Amino acid sequence: MSKGVVHISNNTTAQTSPQASRFAYTRLSRFNDCPYAYRLRYIDGNYPDESSLALELGNTLHKIKELVSLALIQGEHPDYQSIENTFRHVGYKGPDKSSGKEEVFLSLDALALKYMDEWYAPDPDSGPSYREKLETFFRALPDEENDPEWTTIAVELPFEIPYRPGVVLYGFIDKVQQNQDGELRIVDYKSSKKVYDESKLKTPLQLFVYHLAVSALFPDCKITDYLYDFVLLGQKQHGGSKGWLKRAETKLNKLLDSIEDCKTSGEYPPKPSPLCHWCPYCATNPNVGSSFNMLCPYFSLWTPQDRKNFSVNRTYDPDLVCQAEEEVKQSMAIHAFTF
């Protein structure tokens, strides 16, 4: 199949049921990281207004890459200088990909003021500060247009596909590209501080979900490459090792089975780890307002300032969950009365 004659199937939602459970990769990932945090969010309905430099900057960089790709798909030459000036100094408003409502992006200048300490601090993992990493990002922006092998054919591609009875997978894929042989590449942007280690690349569940979606959306094309693009680091990694699709299928099914088991039993055991520090329900997370970060009593005491502390605030006991949650409610009531 030659480039330029891609057929996008429109039948990917035909078999979905209103009664089916819908899972985006972020929801699956949250359960995998910590079933208790999954429960607090998706079962109990606690949706905090999260704000952090990593989150806001990541969204901004995704939008910049999206605008460049859209221009290329439309056969236009992106005005890189204008794009950079707009996002650095002015900010940007545009429709949200999910709701269609206006989405507002602060300028990078504004983010630098809002998160001044983080913005200029050298990164303990990769070295350069965010300010320095942005220079890497903008220097690499024309690389997509100059790629001699791969051409972008879809960006922020929505999907909603039936996976197994009662389960629907949905989401957005950052970018799909095609080469001269008609083969496809799935690209996912990462604004992480460091690249993945080999263990995360062997069986990447996120790329497997996207593989299923692209296979359904482009049934006549073969997917030959799965790429993580670390946009702040100027580095790329290929996901998947030999036999990874079968392993990922097994991994996804086990994860869905575990979610169903927790739903049946009503028990969602926590998995305390250093990841707790970035969880919106953890008391050590400085980026969550209100009292959401008081909801979990089982968090790890690890912080970036205390990296050797792997103790937990409270040990999980299935028989004492009600008592622990009652104590959380009392603490929240005292907090609300005090403030």
Regions found by a protein language model. Give the residues of each.
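Accessory/regulatory regions of helicases
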Residues: 1-14, 277
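Short amphipathic alpha-helical segments and their helix-coil junctions
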Residues: 15-19, 35-48, 186-192, 255-263
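Nuclease catalytic cores
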Residues: 25-73, 154-157
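Short coil/turn segments at secondary-structure boundaries
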Residues: 42-44, 53-55, 77-82, 148-157, ...
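A non-catalytic, helix-rich entry segment at domain boundaries
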Residues: 64-155
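Mg2+/Mn2+-dependent nuclease catalytic core
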Residues: 150-257
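Metal-dependent nuclease catalytic regions and adjoining charged, substrate-binding loops involved
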Residues: 199, 212-339
